[in-house]
Design a protein with these regions (language model features):
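DNA breakage-rejoining catalytic core of tyrosine-based enzymes
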Residues: 1-22, 78-90, 106-107
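Short Lys/Arg-enriched helix C-cap and helix-to-coil transition segments
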Residues: 70-74, 192-198
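Conserved tyrosine-mediated DNA breakage-rejoining catalytic core shared by Y-recombinases
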Residues: 52-96
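Catalytic-site neighborhood detector that most strongly recognizes the C-terminal catalytic loop/helix
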Residues: 171-196
Length: 202
C-alpha cells in the first residue's frame, strides 16, 4: 500500500491493492463487517451511504445477469439534498448480501448495516487495527472507510481503464475534477508493469 500525506498530523490517504483489501476482509471479524468492506471497496459506497441500502434496493438488470444497488441519497454538492444513483453490484457481493439477508431474517426494508455513518467508520477503524495487529504492518492503522472507495475508483480508472463517465455515474462523482486524483495515481501493479523490461542501468 502507499501512504499519501494529507498535510494533517498522522492522517494519510491510503492507496490499497486488491490483495490488501482481501487481507482486511480476512480480519473483518463478522459477516456484517465484511459487507461494509465490500460495499466500500467493490461497490464504491461512501460511509453515510452504506446504512441506507436495504434488500429492496437490489435490482436485477433487464439482461437477467447483472445487478444494480440503488443508493437512495448519495452525495449532492449542489446542496439540494441527496441524489439517488444505481451503483453497479458485482454478482459475488449480491450473493453475500442475499445470504446475509436470509441468515438474519431481514425484511425488504431493513438495512443490511444498521449503523450510523460514524458507526461504519468505527468498524473500518477496528478492522484496520486488527489487521495491523495480526500482520505486523502498521500502515493498515491508517485505513479509513474512504480508502475503500479510493480502491474502488483506482481499480476501475487505472487498473481496468474504464470510461471515466461510467465510473462517475456508478460512483456518484459529479465532475471529472472529482475523479482526477484517482486517474493520476498509478496503482502498485501499474508501476510494476511499467518497469518490466526497463534497463535501469544497474
Amino acid at each position: 500500500m502507499r501512504l499519501e500525506s494529507t498535510g494533517k498530523p498522522d492522517q494519510y490517504k491510503v492507496w490499497l491493492s486488491d490483495e490488501e483489501l482481501d487481507t482486511l476482509r480476512r480480519h473483518a471479524g463478522s459477516k456484517r463487517n465484511d459487507l461494509i468492506l465490500q460495499l466500500g471497496g467493490y461497490v464504491g459506497l461512501r460511509a453515510f451511504e452504506i446504512p441506507q441500502v436495504t434488500p429492496q434496493h437490489v435490482k436485477r438488470t433487464s439482461d437477467g445477469s447483472n445487478y444494480r444497488l440503488r443508493v437512495p441519497e448519495g452525495k449532492d454538492t449542489t446542496g439540494n439534498g441527496g441524489k439517488p444513483r444505481d451503483a453497479y453490484l458485482p454478482a459475488a457481493v449480491e450473493r453475500d448480501l442475499h445470504q446475509y439477508q436470509q441468515e438474519n431474517d431481514l425484511r425488504p426494508s431493513d438495512p443490511y448495516v444498521s449503523l450510523t455513518e460514524s458507526g461504519v467508520r468505527a468498524v473500518v477503524k477496528r478492522v484496520a487495527d486488527a489487521t495491523a495487529d495480526e500482520t505486523g504492518d502498521d500502515d493498515y492503522r491508517h485505513v479509513s472507510s474512504h480508502d475503500l472507495r479510493r480502491r474502488f475508483a483506482q481499480r476501475l480508472l487505472v487498473d481496468e481503464r474504464m470510461n471515466p463517465r461510467v465510473v462517475m455515474a456508478v460512483g456518484g462523482w459529479d465532475s471529472f475534477k472529482a475523479i482526477e486524483p484517482y486517474l493520476n495515481a498509478p496503482s502498485e501493479q501499474v508501476v510494476n508493469d511499467a518497469f518490466q523490461g526497463v534497463d535501469l542501468g544497474v
